[in-house]
A protein has these predicted regions:
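Juxta-kinase regulatory segment immediately upstream of eukaryotic protein kinase catalytic domains
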Residues: 1-20, 209, 213
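ATP-binding glycine-rich loop module of kinase domains
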Residues: 19-61, 68
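Active-site beta-strand termini and strand-to-loop segments that position acidic
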Residues: 32-37, 91-92, 141
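Conserved structural core of kinase catalytic domains
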Residues: 56, 68-113
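AlphaC helix (C-helix) of the protein kinase catalytic domain N-lobe
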Residues: 63, 67-70, 119, 180
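Short C-lobe core helix of eukaryotic-like protein kinase catalytic domains
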Residues: 114-124
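Catalytic-loop of the protein kinase fold
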Residues: 124-140
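C-lobe/activation-segment region of protein kinase-like
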Residues: 141-216
Protein backbone atom coordinates (compact mmCIF):
# COMPACT_ATOMS: atom_id res chain seq x y z
CA UNK A 1 0.00 0.00 0.00
CA UNK A 2 1.41 3.39 -0.99
CA UNK A 3 1.78 6.01 1.73
CA UNK A 4 -0.98 8.15 0.21
CA UNK A 5 -3.46 5.27 0.28
CA UNK A 6 -2.27 4.24 3.74
CA UNK A 7 -2.71 7.74 5.15
CA UNK A 8 -6.21 7.93 3.69
CA UNK A 9 -7.17 4.52 5.10
CA UNK A 10 -5.87 5.42 8.55
CA UNK A 11 -7.63 8.78 8.51
CA UNK A 12 -10.92 7.00 7.78
CA UNK A 13 -10.38 4.52 10.62
CA UNK A 14 -9.75 7.13 13.32
CA UNK A 15 -12.77 7.21 15.60
CA UNK A 16 -13.87 3.69 14.61
CA UNK A 17 -13.38 0.37 16.49
CA UNK A 18 -10.18 -0.08 14.45
CA UNK A 19 -8.71 2.91 16.31
CA UNK A 20 -7.76 2.36 19.96
CA UNK A 21 -6.89 5.42 22.12
CA UNK A 22 -3.78 4.71 24.21
CA UNK A 23 -2.83 8.15 25.55
CA UNK A 24 -4.14 11.69 25.82
CA UNK A 25 -2.27 14.72 27.14
CA UNK A 26 -2.28 18.49 26.82
CA UNK A 27 -0.17 18.33 23.67
CA UNK A 28 -1.59 15.39 21.80
CA UNK A 29 -3.41 12.08 21.57
CA UNK A 30 -2.04 8.68 20.60
CA UNK A 31 -4.02 5.99 18.82
CA UNK A 32 -3.21 2.45 17.79
CA UNK A 33 -4.77 1.83 14.38
CA UNK A 34 -4.98 -1.48 12.55
CA UNK A 35 -5.37 -1.57 8.78
CA UNK A 36 -4.37 -3.97 6.04
CA UNK A 37 -3.16 -6.44 8.67
CA UNK A 38 -0.64 -3.99 10.18
CA UNK A 39 -0.67 -1.82 13.29
CA UNK A 40 0.31 1.85 13.23
CA UNK A 41 0.74 4.56 15.84
CA UNK A 42 -1.14 7.77 15.08
CA UNK A 43 -0.37 11.02 16.86
CA UNK A 44 -2.94 13.83 16.76
CA UNK A 45 -2.49 17.36 18.05
CA UNK A 46 -4.78 18.18 20.97
CA UNK A 47 -7.01 20.97 19.67
CA UNK A 48 -9.32 21.22 22.69
CA UNK A 49 -7.55 24.33 24.05
CA UNK A 50 -7.59 27.16 21.51
CA UNK A 51 -4.44 28.75 22.91
CA UNK A 52 -2.48 25.47 22.74
CA UNK A 53 -3.83 24.38 19.37
CA UNK A 54 -1.27 26.21 17.16
CA UNK A 55 1.61 25.11 19.40
CA UNK A 56 0.49 21.48 19.32
CA UNK A 57 0.08 21.54 15.55
CA UNK A 58 3.54 23.07 15.17
CA UNK A 59 4.93 20.30 17.38
CA UNK A 60 3.41 17.61 15.14
CA UNK A 61 4.77 19.29 12.00
CA UNK A 62 8.21 19.66 13.60
CA UNK A 63 8.17 15.99 14.56
CA UNK A 64 7.27 15.04 10.99
CA UNK A 65 10.25 17.05 9.75
CA UNK A 66 12.58 15.38 12.25
CA UNK A 67 11.47 11.89 11.25
CA UNK A 68 12.23 12.82 7.66
CA UNK A 69 15.82 13.70 8.59
CA UNK A 70 16.20 10.50 10.62
CA UNK A 71 14.69 8.28 7.92
CA UNK A 72 16.18 4.75 7.84
CA UNK A 73 18.14 5.25 11.06
CA UNK A 74 17.94 2.02 13.05
CA UNK A 75 16.23 2.69 16.38
CA UNK A 76 13.92 5.41 15.03
CA UNK A 77 10.32 4.40 14.22
CA UNK A 78 9.38 4.63 10.57
CA UNK A 79 7.28 7.63 9.62
CA UNK A 80 4.60 7.27 6.95
CA UNK A 81 3.65 10.94 6.78
CA UNK A 82 0.81 13.26 7.75
CA UNK A 83 -2.86 12.68 7.00
CA UNK A 84 -4.96 15.47 5.45
CA UNK A 85 -6.02 16.33 9.01
CA UNK A 86 -2.42 16.71 10.14
CA UNK A 87 -2.20 13.43 12.08
CA UNK A 88 1.27 11.87 12.21
CA UNK A 89 1.40 8.18 11.24
CA UNK A 90 4.28 6.14 12.64
CA UNK A 91 5.49 2.58 12.94
CA UNK A 92 4.02 0.93 16.04
CA UNK A 93 6.78 -0.37 18.30
CA UNK A 94 5.64 -3.49 20.12
CA UNK A 95 7.37 -2.97 23.43
CA UNK A 96 7.40 -0.98 26.65
CA UNK A 97 8.67 2.38 27.77
CA UNK A 98 12.04 2.61 29.49
CA UNK A 99 10.11 3.75 32.55
CA UNK A 100 8.57 0.28 32.75
CA UNK A 101 11.82 -1.52 31.87
CA UNK A 102 14.41 0.48 33.81
CA UNK A 103 14.93 -2.01 36.63
CA UNK A 104 15.12 -4.98 34.29
CA UNK A 105 17.74 -3.14 32.23
CA UNK A 106 19.85 -2.07 35.20
CA UNK A 107 23.45 -3.08 34.47
CA UNK A 108 22.69 -4.16 30.88
CA UNK A 109 25.77 -2.73 29.16
CA UNK A 110 24.67 -3.95 25.73
CA UNK A 111 21.44 -1.96 25.94
CA UNK A 112 23.14 1.23 27.07
CA UNK A 113 25.92 0.87 24.49
CA UNK A 114 23.25 0.52 21.79
CA UNK A 115 21.40 3.54 23.17
CA UNK A 116 24.56 5.65 23.15
CA UNK A 117 25.33 4.70 19.53
CA UNK A 118 21.77 5.64 18.58
CA UNK A 119 21.98 9.04 20.28
CA UNK A 120 25.34 9.81 18.63
CA UNK A 121 24.00 8.72 15.22
CA UNK A 122 21.02 11.04 15.72
CA UNK A 123 23.33 13.95 16.57
CA UNK A 124 25.47 13.23 13.51
CA UNK A 125 22.36 13.74 11.38
CA UNK A 126 21.83 17.16 12.94
CA UNK A 127 19.04 16.29 15.38
CA UNK A 128 19.08 16.97 19.14
CA UNK A 129 16.14 15.49 21.04
CA UNK A 130 16.35 17.60 24.19
CA UNK A 131 13.97 15.55 26.34
CA UNK A 132 15.58 12.15 26.78
CA UNK A 133 15.61 12.45 30.54
CA UNK A 134 11.90 11.69 30.30
CA UNK A 135 11.81 7.91 30.51
CA UNK A 136 8.68 7.62 28.38
CA UNK A 137 10.61 9.00 25.40
CA UNK A 138 12.67 5.81 25.26
CA UNK A 139 11.02 2.64 24.02
CA UNK A 140 12.34 -0.90 24.43
CA UNK A 141 11.16 -3.70 22.15
CA UNK A 142 10.90 -7.40 22.97
CA UNK A 143 14.55 -7.93 22.02
CA UNK A 144 15.61 -5.14 24.42
CA UNK A 145 16.46 -2.87 21.52
CA UNK A 146 16.19 0.89 22.25
CA UNK A 147 14.05 3.29 20.24
CA UNK A 148 13.83 7.08 20.52
CA UNK A 149 10.36 8.62 20.27
CA UNK A 150 8.50 11.91 20.69
CA UNK A 151 10.50 14.48 18.73
CA UNK A 152 7.96 17.28 19.10
CA UNK A 153 10.43 19.71 20.66
CA UNK A 154 13.58 18.39 18.96
CA UNK A 155 15.78 20.81 17.06
CA UNK A 156 17.16 20.36 13.55
CA UNK A 157 20.56 21.86 12.75
CA UNK A 158 21.39 22.57 9.13
CA UNK A 159 24.69 23.83 7.70
CA UNK A 160 22.95 27.15 7.07
CA UNK A 161 21.61 27.41 10.62
CA UNK A 162 22.51 30.61 12.43
CA UNK A 163 24.77 30.98 15.46
CA UNK A 164 21.96 30.97 18.03
CA UNK A 165 20.34 27.82 16.66
CA UNK A 166 23.70 26.04 16.57
CA UNK A 167 24.33 27.10 20.16
CA UNK A 168 20.94 25.73 21.26
CA UNK A 169 21.67 22.52 19.36
CA UNK A 170 24.96 22.08 21.22
CA UNK A 171 23.22 22.57 24.57
CA UNK A 172 20.49 20.04 23.75
CA UNK A 173 23.13 17.65 22.45
CA UNK A 174 24.82 17.77 25.86
CA UNK A 175 21.43 17.31 27.52
CA UNK A 176 20.83 14.13 25.48
CA UNK A 177 24.18 12.63 26.50
CA UNK A 178 23.67 13.65 30.12
CA UNK A 179 20.31 11.88 29.99
CA UNK A 180 22.09 8.72 28.85
CA UNK A 181 24.44 9.01 31.83
CA UNK A 182 21.49 9.55 34.16
CA UNK A 183 19.68 6.43 32.94
CA UNK A 184 22.76 4.22 32.90
CA UNK A 185 24.02 5.21 36.34
CA UNK A 186 20.64 5.84 38.03
CA UNK A 187 21.79 9.27 39.30
CA UNK A 188 24.91 7.76 40.94
CA UNK A 189 27.17 10.31 39.28
CA UNK A 190 30.13 9.39 41.47
CA UNK A 191 30.17 5.94 39.84
CA UNK A 192 30.59 7.16 36.26
CA UNK A 193 33.46 5.33 34.57
CA UNK A 194 36.42 7.29 33.23
CA UNK A 195 35.38 6.36 29.68
CA UNK A 196 31.78 7.52 30.14
CA UNK A 197 32.89 10.79 31.69
CA UNK A 198 33.71 11.85 28.13
CA UNK A 199 29.96 12.03 27.49
CA UNK A 200 29.03 13.85 30.67
CA UNK A 201 29.03 17.63 30.87
CA UNK A 202 26.10 18.98 32.90
CA UNK A 203 24.78 22.32 31.74
CA UNK A 204 24.50 25.29 34.09
CA UNK A 205 20.75 24.75 34.26
CA UNK A 206 21.22 21.10 35.24
CA UNK A 207 23.76 22.01 37.92
CA UNK A 208 21.43 24.62 39.38
CA UNK A 209 18.43 22.29 39.24
CA UNK A 210 20.31 19.46 40.93
CA UNK A 211 21.78 21.68 43.65
CA UNK A 212 18.80 23.81 44.55
CA UNK A 213 15.66 22.00 43.39
CA UNK A 214 16.13 18.25 43.20
CA UNK A 215 18.59 15.63 42.04
CA UNK A 216 18.17 15.14 38.34
Amino acid sequence: MENRDLLKAISEKLGTPSSVPIFEGNQGKLFKVKTDGNIYLVKSANASNWWLKPINRWSIENEHKVYGVLRNLDGIPKCYGLTNNGDLVLEYIDGKSYRDMQFELDGNDHFFDSLLKLIIAMHNKGIAHGDLKRKDNLMVDKDLKPYLVDFGTAIVKYDRSGFIKKMVFDVLKKTDLNAWIKHKYKRSYDKISSEDLNYYSPTSIEKFYRKFIKRI
